[in-house]
Amino acid sequence: VWLWMEFPFHDQFGGKDTGIDLVARTVEGEYWAIQCKCYAADTFINKPDVDTFLATSGKRFETEFGMTGFAQRLWISTTNKWNSTAEQTIRNQNPPVTRLNLIDLENDDVNWSSLEQGLFGVASRPKPFAIREHQQEAIDQAHAYFKIDEATGQPAHTRGKLIMACGTGKTFTSLRIAENETGGRGLVLFLVPSIALLGQTLRSWLQQSQEPMTAVCICSDPQVSKQTEKKDNDTTSVIDLALPASTDVPSIVKQLQHARRHNAEGLTVVFSTYQSIDVISRAQQQLLAETGGAFG
C-alpha cells in the first residue's frame, strides 16, 4: 500500500488534487485506487465529492510491465449518508467501485484500540466466538451424517439439511461444519438468495475463520444485484460487499486459479446468489478444463 505521493506512477496523473489518497497492489498484481474521507457522521456525500476520484482513477498509466489501469476503486468514509445522485454515480462503473461506510468500520473485524497501540494483523483482531453446546451438537451430527462409508469409500450422504432456530448461530455453525468436513483445506460453494445475506455471510466467515480463507464473490444478474428502488426488500448492492463481486467468467477463473496456487493450506469459498448458478457452472467447466479435472 502506498500513499498517493509515494505511488511510483503518480506523476503520470498530473495536478495535486487527484482525489486518490492510497494505492494498493493485490497479491494478483492488480492496482486499487482508494479514497479516504473523514466526515462528520451526519454529513451527506454529494456527487461533486466523488467526481474527481472517479475521473482520476479511470485513467490508465504505464508501469514497467506496460500500460495498465486500476482494477478496482474503494471509497472509505466516516458517514453512512449518501446523496441519491452520488450513489447512482458510483454504481455500474468500470472499473467498479465498492464502498466502506461508517457502519462497516464500526462492525469490522478490527480492535481499533489495538491498532492505536501499534498492533496489526492477527494481533488486532478480536477473539473468535466459542462454539456453544447446541452448535457443537450440530457439527457432530453433520459429520456423522456425511461420514465416509468404509465399504464403498463414498460419503453415506451427499446432501443434507440442517434446521436451526433464528438467533442460534446458523452462519457461524455452517462455517465450523465446512472447516471440519474439509480439514480446513478445500473448495466450498456457499449459495444464498440475496446479496444482503451474501454480504452478511461473507463478513461473518472472514471474521470467524480459523484457517486462511480466500473468498470469491459472484453476484447475481445486474438487474437484481444492483436494484436500488426503496420499495425493494433487498436494497443491498454489490458496491456494499466487503469484497468485489463479478459475473465475468475469466475473472472468476483467474481468482480461483490464484487461490489454488497460493492458498493450499486454507479454504477457498465461492459466495454466490442463486441467480448466478449459470455463471458458476460456466466458470467451473472452464476451471476443470484448465486443470485437467483436478480442481473445480
How should these model regions be labeled?
Residues 275-276, 288-296:
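SF2 helicase catalytic motif II
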Residues 42-46, 82-89, 198-201, 224-231, ...:
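Switch/connector loops and helix/strand junctions flanking conserved nucleotide-binding motifs
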Residues 263-281:
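Conserved two-lobed SF2 helicase motor
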Residues 187, 265-269, 294:
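Loop/turn-to-beta-strand initiation segments
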Residues 232-268:
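Conserved motor-coupling elements within RecA-like helicase/translocase cores
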Residues 185-209, 214-228, 274-276:
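Conserved Walker A/P-loop ATP-binding site and its immediately adjacent core
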Residues 1-3, 8-12, 60-168, 172-186, ...:
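ATP-dependent helicase/translocase motor core
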Residues 1-67:
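Catalytic centers of nucleases
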